[in-house]
Regions:
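Structural signature for extended repeat/solenoid scaffolds and their inter-repeat hinge/linker regions
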Residues: 1-146
Length: 146
């Protein structure tokens, strides 16, 4: 994974084998003009990578929420209000975090498409804890043939 720092961000610099001619950026850090996405310590349970649109005001966000008994993950883009939410679904924690459901949600205010050249299995058949192959359809076939 490589995330190139943007102009104005503070970075942590180390040196390969202690050689000052071989600097390497090993991380980024926050400062007064580059604050964490959500207020601390109020939202200490959120691990977030949030970008800002170049010459714009929108953002993309990867958020991992480790709230006890309500863990979740989300990948979101302000463009089209598009998002993939996984786990315990809530409204954003900084806005109160009211429950919305459990499982997953893939949503957009724009168009969406699902493509699979070799086929697509869409089922409501239970397969707890991913206990079989992702294309396992034995039970589905049994139900259809019954």
């Amino acid at each position: 994974h490589m995330a190139i720092p943007r102009i104005g961000q503070e970075v942590i610099v180390d040196y390969l084998d202690g050689d000052c001619d071989q600097p390497i950026v090993t991380g980024r850090t926050y400062r007064a003009t580059n604050r964490p996405p959500y207020a601390l310590p109020d939202h200490k349970i959120l691990s977030t990578i949030k970008s800002k649109e170049y010459k714009g005001s929108r953002a993309n966000e990867l958020r991992i929420d480790d709230t006890t008994a309500q863990i979740s993950a989300a990948l979101m883009s302000d463009h089209g209000a598009s998002a993939l939410h996984l786990g315990y679904l809530t409204h954003p924690r900084p806005e109160g975090g009211k429950p919305r459901g459990e499982g997953f949600e893939l949503r957009t205010d724009e168009h969406g498409a699902v493509r699979a050249a070799k086929g697509l299995l869409l089922s409501t058949e239970e397969q707890l804890r991913a206990g079989a192959g992702h294309l396992d359809r034995g039970v589905v076939v049994q139900v259809l043939e019954a």
